[in-house]
């Protein structure tokens, strides 16, 4: 064999290998970026969330989305479909910033006619710079540029881990996956023994940072709201946005008090709600003053994360119009409940519930 023949053979084999790899990834498509999986169970886990969300947002059939952090991961779209109508999917980003959540909304609105957004608001998510993601997002899966998908085609994890997982489940299906994806509710221990060990309470009164007389959004919050919330609300007047504030345990609010930022956080929350309520296509629900939930540590695995039963209960409550905020007086009343419960905890110097 001559050098030219050897070179031609080598190049042909190389081209065949490259083409075969691209074809294999594109056809099997473990993250459903090009088409929804029908011949196997896609490897959708909390660890693949930002990859899986790209395919779900692009190629699943839906008209409603769940947006938010781990506080939203235990929602069951089948229940939401029954309560609100339509077809829900979850586009959650565990620990996401408001920019991360904005990216999910952007892809959903650019590919589907979205009639309803259920959005769980964590104030922490608005403390980041409005263009800052809290996770490294595979942006090449979120755009329409096919050429940069080379990072997907030749991804070592895709080739060595996720394609084999797909092949293992070849011929199988999981009709419940739309509910079970990202769901962690059954994986942890709940109750005082899980939440309280090692935690020390104090009767010491902590001076709170001055929040000002009138609730006003901080500059950081303003930028997040202006860039990551309002454009979608204003550009999609026929879409119903259902924002809710998750029911963190009372211990979480006590920690905020210990840090001296309780009043600041409550004022930021009130100012944010007042901005959102100015829009006709927005509903706001506040579950943070639900004493029957937040004082019962059997609902929690830590200071914030509650069971799937609470997600189910929130869905039922929203469908019934319960805990809906319609004005400033109601916000202040809810905040007063939190203040009072924290005061009880400080006075007791131990968990009194």
What label would you give each PLM region?
Residues 120-124, 198-204, 243-249, 287-290:
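Short loop/turn segments at strand-loop or loop-helix junctions that form parts
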Residues 28-90, 96-107:
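Membrane/wall-proximal cationic-aromatic binding patches
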Residues 233, 238-241, 249-297:
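Extended hydrophobic/aromatic segments used for targeting, binding, or gating
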